[in-house]
Design a protein with these regions (language model features):
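N-terminal Rossmann NAD(P)H-binding glycine-rich loop of SDR-like oxidoreductase domains
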Residues: 4-24
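Conserved glycine-rich Rossmann-like NAD(P)H-binding loop of the short-chain dehydrogenase/reductase
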Residues: 25-39
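NAD(P)H-binding glycine-rich loop region in Rossmannoid oxidoreductase-like domains
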Residues: 46-51, 55-99
Length: 313
Protein backbone atom coordinates (compact mmCIF):
# COMPACT_ATOMS: atom_id res chain seq x y z
CA UNK A 1 0.00 0.00 0.00
CA UNK A 2 1.34 3.44 -0.91
CA UNK A 3 0.54 6.77 0.64
CA UNK A 4 1.72 10.27 1.47
CA UNK A 5 2.40 11.70 4.92
CA UNK A 6 2.22 15.51 5.23
CA UNK A 7 3.70 17.11 8.34
CA UNK A 8 1.91 20.32 9.20
CA UNK A 9 -0.78 18.90 6.97
CA UNK A 10 -3.61 20.94 8.49
CA UNK A 11 -1.95 24.24 7.60
CA UNK A 12 -2.82 26.21 4.48
CA UNK A 13 -0.16 24.59 2.27
CA UNK A 14 -0.75 21.10 3.64
CA UNK A 15 -4.48 21.42 3.06
CA UNK A 16 -3.99 22.60 -0.54
CA UNK A 17 -1.56 19.75 -1.20
CA UNK A 18 -4.17 17.34 0.18
CA UNK A 19 -6.86 18.86 -2.05
CA UNK A 20 -4.70 18.32 -5.12
CA UNK A 21 -3.85 14.76 -4.11
CA UNK A 22 -7.52 13.92 -3.48
CA UNK A 23 -8.53 15.48 -6.81
CA UNK A 24 -6.03 13.22 -8.57
CA UNK A 25 -6.96 10.07 -6.65
CA UNK A 26 -9.64 10.23 -3.92
CA UNK A 27 -8.78 6.73 -2.67
CA UNK A 28 -5.07 7.16 -1.98
CA UNK A 29 -3.79 7.10 1.58
CA UNK A 30 -2.96 10.60 2.89
CA UNK A 31 -1.82 11.05 6.50
CA UNK A 32 -2.30 14.54 7.93
CA UNK A 33 0.17 14.89 10.79
CA UNK A 34 0.02 18.01 12.98
CA UNK A 35 -0.38 19.17 16.55
CA UNK A 36 -3.37 21.49 15.99
CA UNK A 37 -6.57 19.65 16.89
CA UNK A 38 -8.77 22.59 15.87
CA UNK A 39 -7.29 22.84 12.38
CA UNK A 40 -7.56 19.10 11.91
CA UNK A 41 -11.23 19.15 12.87
CA UNK A 42 -11.92 22.01 10.45
CA UNK A 43 -10.09 20.12 7.72
CA UNK A 44 -12.13 16.97 8.42
CA UNK A 45 -15.27 18.90 7.52
CA UNK A 46 -13.84 19.60 4.06
CA UNK A 47 -11.91 16.35 3.57
CA UNK A 48 -13.52 13.59 5.67
CA UNK A 49 -11.49 10.76 7.11
CA UNK A 50 -11.48 7.86 4.68
CA UNK A 51 -10.17 4.86 6.58
CA UNK A 52 -7.17 2.87 5.29
CA UNK A 53 -7.58 4.36 1.80
CA UNK A 54 -8.16 8.10 2.00
CA UNK A 55 -7.37 10.89 4.42
CA UNK A 56 -6.25 10.00 7.94
CA UNK A 57 -5.58 12.48 10.73
CA UNK A 58 -2.93 12.01 13.39
CA UNK A 59 -2.09 14.38 16.23
CA UNK A 60 1.57 14.40 17.14
CA UNK A 61 4.67 16.39 18.00
CA UNK A 62 7.07 16.96 15.12
CA UNK A 63 9.97 16.07 17.42
CA UNK A 64 8.53 12.65 18.32
CA UNK A 65 10.44 10.28 16.04
CA UNK A 66 8.54 7.20 17.24
CA UNK A 67 5.17 8.82 16.59
CA UNK A 68 6.33 9.97 13.17
CA UNK A 69 7.55 6.47 12.35
CA UNK A 70 4.14 5.07 13.26
CA UNK A 71 2.45 7.70 11.09
CA UNK A 72 4.63 6.72 8.12
CA UNK A 73 3.46 3.11 8.14
CA UNK A 74 2.19 2.18 4.65
CA UNK A 75 3.48 5.50 3.24
CA UNK A 76 6.07 5.80 0.50
CA UNK A 77 6.28 9.61 0.30
CA UNK A 78 6.72 12.35 2.90
CA UNK A 79 6.12 16.08 2.50
CA UNK A 80 7.60 18.06 5.39
CA UNK A 81 5.69 21.36 5.71
CA UNK A 82 5.55 21.76 9.50
CA UNK A 83 7.33 24.84 10.86
CA UNK A 84 7.02 27.93 12.98
CA UNK A 85 6.80 30.62 10.29
CA UNK A 86 6.07 33.99 11.93
CA UNK A 87 9.31 35.97 11.94
CA UNK A 88 8.54 37.96 15.09
CA UNK A 89 7.42 34.83 16.98
CA UNK A 90 10.67 33.08 16.10
CA UNK A 91 12.70 36.08 17.30
CA UNK A 92 10.84 36.20 20.62
CA UNK A 93 10.97 32.44 21.19
CA UNK A 94 14.30 31.29 19.76
CA UNK A 95 14.24 28.00 21.64
CA UNK A 96 10.85 26.86 20.35
CA UNK A 97 11.67 28.00 16.81
CA UNK A 98 14.82 25.88 16.92
CA UNK A 99 13.02 22.92 18.51
CA UNK A 100 10.28 22.85 15.87
CA UNK A 101 12.11 23.96 12.74
CA UNK A 102 15.49 22.32 13.33
CA UNK A 103 15.01 19.42 15.72
CA UNK A 104 11.62 18.66 14.20
CA UNK A 105 13.21 18.37 10.77
CA UNK A 106 15.91 16.10 12.18
CA UNK A 107 13.18 13.89 13.69
CA UNK A 108 11.28 13.70 10.40
CA UNK A 109 14.48 12.82 8.50
CA UNK A 110 15.34 10.09 11.00
CA UNK A 111 11.81 8.67 10.81
CA UNK A 112 12.01 8.64 7.00
CA UNK A 113 15.31 6.77 7.15
CA UNK A 114 13.99 4.33 9.73
CA UNK A 115 10.82 3.75 7.69
CA UNK A 116 12.69 3.35 4.37
CA UNK A 117 10.59 6.06 2.72
CA UNK A 118 11.62 6.19 -0.97
CA UNK A 119 10.97 9.92 -1.53
CA UNK A 120 10.81 12.83 0.93
CA UNK A 121 10.64 16.56 0.22
CA UNK A 122 11.21 19.52 2.53
CA UNK A 123 9.46 22.87 2.07
CA UNK A 124 12.03 25.61 2.63
CA UNK A 125 11.98 29.39 2.10
CA UNK A 126 13.94 32.18 0.47
CA UNK A 127 14.62 33.48 3.98
CA UNK A 128 16.97 30.51 4.46
CA UNK A 129 19.31 32.08 1.89
CA UNK A 130 21.95 34.31 3.54
CA UNK A 131 19.72 34.37 6.65
CA UNK A 132 19.49 37.37 8.98
CA UNK A 133 16.58 36.27 11.20
CA UNK A 134 16.02 33.39 13.60
CA UNK A 135 13.39 32.03 11.24
CA UNK A 136 15.82 32.12 8.32
CA UNK A 137 18.55 30.53 10.43
CA UNK A 138 16.32 27.64 11.52
CA UNK A 139 15.07 26.98 8.00
CA UNK A 140 18.58 27.18 6.57
CA UNK A 141 19.94 24.72 9.10
CA UNK A 142 16.95 22.46 8.50
CA UNK A 143 17.73 22.56 4.77
CA UNK A 144 21.28 21.40 5.49
CA UNK A 145 20.07 18.62 7.77
CA UNK A 146 17.53 17.42 5.22
CA UNK A 147 19.93 17.33 2.27
CA UNK A 148 22.71 15.73 4.34
CA UNK A 149 20.26 13.00 5.35
CA UNK A 150 21.00 11.44 1.96
CA UNK A 151 24.41 10.46 3.36
CA UNK A 152 22.73 8.31 5.99
CA UNK A 153 20.12 6.51 3.91
CA UNK A 154 20.49 4.15 0.98
CA UNK A 155 16.75 3.93 0.42
CA UNK A 156 15.37 7.47 0.82
CA UNK A 157 15.85 10.33 -1.64
CA UNK A 158 15.75 13.60 0.30
CA UNK A 159 15.11 16.75 -1.76
CA UNK A 160 13.76 20.24 -1.05
CA UNK A 161 11.85 23.17 -2.50
CA UNK A 162 12.81 26.76 -1.76
CA UNK A 163 10.49 29.64 -2.63
CA UNK A 164 9.10 32.99 -1.46
CA UNK A 165 5.82 34.05 0.10
CA UNK A 166 2.43 32.46 -0.58
CA UNK A 167 -0.39 34.92 -1.15
CA UNK A 168 -3.25 32.88 0.31
CA UNK A 169 -1.51 31.34 3.32
CA UNK A 170 -3.20 31.85 6.69
CA UNK A 171 -0.28 33.91 7.98
CA UNK A 172 0.06 36.10 4.90
CA UNK A 173 0.36 39.85 5.42
CA UNK A 174 -2.52 40.31 3.00
CA UNK A 175 -5.01 38.99 5.55
CA UNK A 176 -3.87 41.67 8.00
CA UNK A 177 -3.99 44.33 5.31
CA UNK A 178 -7.52 43.37 4.27
CA UNK A 179 -8.67 43.69 7.89
CA UNK A 180 -7.04 47.13 8.16
CA UNK A 181 -8.63 48.17 4.87
CA UNK A 182 -12.07 47.25 6.17
CA UNK A 183 -11.37 49.29 9.31
CA UNK A 184 -10.12 52.27 7.29
CA UNK A 185 -6.68 52.16 8.90
CA UNK A 186 -3.25 52.82 7.34
CA UNK A 187 -1.39 49.90 5.78
CA UNK A 188 1.95 49.24 7.53
CA UNK A 189 5.04 48.76 5.35
CA UNK A 190 8.45 48.24 6.91
CA UNK A 191 10.55 49.96 4.23
CA UNK A 192 9.65 51.85 1.02
CA UNK A 193 12.03 49.78 -1.13
CA UNK A 194 11.34 46.31 0.24
CA UNK A 195 10.51 43.62 -2.33
CA UNK A 196 9.25 40.06 -1.91
CA UNK A 197 8.62 37.02 -4.07
CA UNK A 198 4.95 36.01 -4.21
CA UNK A 199 2.88 33.30 -5.82
CA UNK A 200 -0.41 31.52 -5.24
CA UNK A 201 -1.14 28.73 -2.81
CA UNK A 202 -2.22 26.48 -5.68
CA UNK A 203 1.07 27.04 -7.54
CA UNK A 204 3.10 26.39 -4.39
CA UNK A 205 1.34 23.09 -3.69
CA UNK A 206 1.60 22.00 -7.31
CA UNK A 207 5.32 22.78 -7.40
CA UNK A 208 5.98 20.69 -4.29
CA UNK A 209 4.04 17.73 -5.67
CA UNK A 210 5.72 17.86 -9.09
CA UNK A 211 9.21 18.01 -7.59
CA UNK A 212 8.32 15.15 -5.26
CA UNK A 213 7.43 13.12 -8.35
CA UNK A 214 10.33 14.01 -10.65
CA UNK A 215 12.98 15.49 -8.35
CA UNK A 216 16.42 14.02 -7.81
CA UNK A 217 18.18 13.04 -4.62
CA UNK A 218 19.93 15.90 -2.82
CA UNK A 219 18.66 18.75 -5.02
CA UNK A 220 16.98 21.97 -3.86
CA UNK A 221 14.39 23.25 -6.33
CA UNK A 222 13.43 26.92 -6.69
CA UNK A 223 10.69 28.16 -9.02
CA UNK A 224 11.08 31.08 -11.39
CA UNK A 225 9.25 33.72 -9.34
CA UNK A 226 8.39 37.37 -9.79
CA UNK A 227 9.47 39.90 -7.17
CA UNK A 228 7.05 42.67 -6.19
CA UNK A 229 7.55 46.06 -4.53
CA UNK A 230 5.53 45.75 -1.32
CA UNK A 231 4.81 49.48 -1.14
CA UNK A 232 2.98 49.28 -4.49
CA UNK A 233 0.90 46.31 -3.37
CA UNK A 234 0.01 48.08 -0.11
CA UNK A 235 -1.50 50.96 -2.12
CA UNK A 236 -4.17 48.54 -3.36
CA UNK A 237 -5.40 48.21 0.23
CA UNK A 238 -5.12 51.79 1.44
CA UNK A 239 -2.58 54.40 2.43
CA UNK A 240 0.85 52.88 3.18
CA UNK A 241 2.69 54.04 6.28
CA UNK A 242 6.38 53.27 6.83
CA UNK A 243 6.88 51.58 10.21
CA UNK A 244 10.53 50.55 10.14
CA UNK A 245 11.89 47.10 10.92
CA UNK A 246 10.47 45.20 13.91
CA UNK A 247 12.66 42.14 13.40
CA UNK A 248 15.77 41.32 11.38
CA UNK A 249 14.75 41.42 7.71
CA UNK A 250 16.29 42.07 4.31
CA UNK A 251 15.17 44.65 1.78
CA UNK A 252 15.42 42.09 -1.03
CA UNK A 253 15.17 38.31 -0.72
CA UNK A 254 17.02 35.96 -3.05
CA UNK A 255 16.41 32.33 -4.01
CA UNK A 256 20.06 31.28 -4.04
CA UNK A 257 23.36 32.78 -2.94
CA UNK A 258 25.98 34.23 -5.27
CA UNK A 259 28.11 31.20 -4.47
CA UNK A 260 25.27 28.80 -5.30
CA UNK A 261 24.96 30.36 -8.75
CA UNK A 262 27.81 28.13 -9.92
CA UNK A 263 25.81 25.08 -8.82
CA UNK A 264 22.41 26.20 -10.15
CA UNK A 265 20.89 24.91 -13.40
CA UNK A 266 17.87 26.34 -15.20
CA UNK A 267 15.19 23.74 -15.86
CA UNK A 268 12.87 26.09 -17.77
CA UNK A 269 10.27 27.32 -15.29
CA UNK A 270 12.34 26.39 -12.26
CA UNK A 271 15.93 25.93 -11.09
CA UNK A 272 17.85 23.00 -9.65
CA UNK A 273 20.36 23.97 -6.96
CA UNK A 274 23.12 21.50 -6.21
CA UNK A 275 24.07 22.66 -2.70
CA UNK A 276 27.66 22.89 -1.61
CA UNK A 277 28.42 20.70 1.38
CA UNK A 278 28.23 22.50 4.73
CA UNK A 279 29.31 20.86 7.98
CA UNK A 280 26.18 21.81 9.90
CA UNK A 281 23.68 19.30 8.54
CA UNK A 282 25.94 16.28 8.81
CA UNK A 283 27.09 17.30 12.28
CA UNK A 284 23.50 17.12 13.48
CA UNK A 285 22.75 13.91 11.61
CA UNK A 286 25.61 11.95 13.14
CA UNK A 287 24.48 12.70 16.67
CA UNK A 288 25.77 16.09 17.77
CA UNK A 289 25.00 16.62 21.46
CA UNK A 290 21.99 18.75 20.62
CA UNK A 291 20.83 18.91 24.19
CA UNK A 292 23.91 20.93 25.08
CA UNK A 293 23.87 23.04 21.92
CA UNK A 294 20.17 23.87 22.10
CA UNK A 295 19.68 23.78 25.84
CA UNK A 296 19.05 27.52 26.15
CA UNK A 297 18.31 30.59 24.08
CA UNK A 298 21.85 31.86 24.74
CA UNK A 299 23.43 28.68 23.35
CA UNK A 300 21.16 28.83 20.31
CA UNK A 301 22.00 32.50 19.70
CA UNK A 302 25.72 31.68 19.71
CA UNK A 303 25.16 28.77 17.35
CA UNK A 304 22.96 30.94 15.10
CA UNK A 305 25.73 33.53 14.79
CA UNK A 306 28.25 30.85 13.77
CA UNK A 307 25.81 29.39 11.26
CA UNK A 308 24.92 32.74 9.67
CA UNK A 309 28.58 33.77 9.51
CA UNK A 310 29.41 30.46 7.84
CA UNK A 311 26.67 30.85 5.23
CA UNK A 312 27.28 34.49 4.38
CA UNK A 313 31.08 34.53 4.40
Amino acid sequence: MSGTLITGGAGSLGREITRQLVAKNPHQRIVIYSRDEGKQQAMREEIPEGGPDGARYMLGDICDTDRLTAAMKYCDRVIHCAALKMIDTCEYDVYEATRINVMGTLSVAKACTRSHIPRAIYVSTDKAVDPVSTYGFTKGLAEDIWIHSNLHSDTCSFMATRYGNVISSTKSVFHQWEKLRMEGKPIPVTHPDVTRYYWTLSNAANFVLKRLEDGSRGIIYAPSMRSYLIHDIAKLYGTPTITGWRCPEKIHEILWTDHETSYTTSMGHYYAIYPESHPWGDTFMVGMPVTSTCSSADHISDFKKDFIDGHTA
